[in-house]
Amino acid sequence: MSPKTETKASVGFKAGVKDYKLTYYTPDYETKSTDILAAFRVTPQPGVPPEEAGAAVAAESSTGTWTTVWTDGLTSLDRYKGRCYHIEPVAGEESQFIAYVAYPLDLFEEGSVTNMFTSIVGNVFGFKALRALRLEDLRIPPAYSKTFQGPPHGIQVERDKLNKYGRPLLGCTIKPKLGLSAKNYGRAVYECLRGGLDFTKDDENVNSQPFMRWRDRFLFCAEAIYKSQAETGEIKGHYLNATAGTCEEMIKRAVFARELGVPIVMHDYLTGGFTANTTLAHYCRDNGLLLHIHRAMHAVIDRQKNHGMHFRVLAKALRMSGGDHIHAGTVVGKLEGERDITLGFVDLLRDDFIEKDRSRGIYFTQDWVSMPGVLPVASGGIHVWHMPALTEIFGDDSVLQFGGGTLGQPWGNAPRAVANRVALEACVQARNEGRDLAREGNEIIREASKWSPELAAACEVWKEIKFEFAEWIPCNQ
């Protein structure tokens, strides 16, 4: 190629590795009400300036690539590019900072969590200029959230369907989670429901294995639901796990559940995927089914504090994709989490409007407008002695899910369920009378156990149970 030709071809175009901060670091940018805002915890490689690292995150999660390309001239980068508009240090961490990035709304397909995450938490997390990257929070503007259906029904509609008000709902995961035949599984469900629980649950591992095929399980669980309803006069449910290897098979299982007339099905939304979850949520709204969500695999994504994604982001994504319940940790028990941080994302699940509050890990004010709320599910190593704390911490709009805490005392499933129901009713009554559950919780349980032999037996079984692990970092189920 002649020098003259090179000169003509290079007019307005310079190849090579470019500095991202020249285009994508815009500290003077004023965010728009329609922008999706992200807060990233960035750990750059040694020698990479914060401005360059933050700009690289904005570029690689939006319109940028590592070099200038001639097709940049065929569109408006100023209209479509992500912008790193603010950088702040992380207290106590010399090599980390929070980079705030604004994304124009037109970068994302309407009603698609899958597409949103493909951009914001896609290839940028493997970028060489970064040692680690964690998405701490997202601000979803109403202009985008209104393109999602959200939860199939929401908290108020669920209470109306169940005719249950003024208290948390009670659940139990059937154990052992694998190995029971369908008939024995259904018997365990029946005993728990007739003892006073509102729900029982398939473990997230239970799909359709050789020892118990899904159709058999659905039939025996439906029988258990109807029999317990007839005996107690209360509406009951069992979270029938519809998670499957294909979306078509998942919907087939949900259709069968609807034909049986049961009130609720279940999905593992992270292992199943957001496309499958949104598909199931739409089916559930159209067909009157509640949808319980388990978060299996979340700790792979959210456990490391420097890399991955905080669960509050996964919680927001679930509310958009759709689910009426989701597991959210306990604050107490074997999967104890930080109280303020946990309640921060619990409020993001339940409330319509949540103010920015960094002490609770909430980086942005979030307005869900009219999107229905999601019931948080507290589960993992909890038992009757935890009931006062759980009632006080989570309030009425929650599901308290006792697995081993229901099935692990010696009198049988129904008396164990009675113990949990009595403990809950005692705590709710004491709270309504103005008693302090945080200070008087143990005394409230002891008083109730005097007239409930089932609760007295449970109190004796669980009185010495503690979860203490040296050098162990807790995660939430």
UniProtKB/Swiss-Prot annotation:
Entry EC number(s): 4.1.1.39
Cofactor: Mg(2+)
PROSITE patterns referenced in this protein's UniProt entry, alphabetically: RUBISCO_LARGE
Post-translational modification: The disulfide bond which can form in the large chain dimeric partners within the hexadecamer appears to be associated with oxidative stress and protein turnover.
Binding residues annotated for Mg(2+), in chain numbering: 201, 203-204
Principal cellular location given in the protein's record: plastid
CDD domains per record: RuBisCO_large_I
Catalytic activities: 2 (2R)-3-phosphoglycerate + 2 H(+) = D-ribulose 1,5-bisphosphate + CO2 + H2O; D-ribulose 1,5-bisphosphate + O2 = 2-phosphoglycolate + (2R)-3-phosphoglycerate + 2 H(+)
Residues modified as N-acetylproline: 3
Self-association and partners: Heterohexadecamer of 8 large chains and 8 small chains; disulfide-linked. The disulfide link is formed within the large subunit homodimers.
Record's miscellaneous remark: The basic functional RuBisCO is composed of a large chain homodimer in a 'head-to-tail' conformation. In form I RuBisCO this homodimer is arranged in a barrel-like tetramer with the small subunits forming a tetrameric 'cap' on each end of the 'barrel'.
Record's protein name: Ribulose bisphosphate carboxylase large chain
The gene coding this protein: rbcL
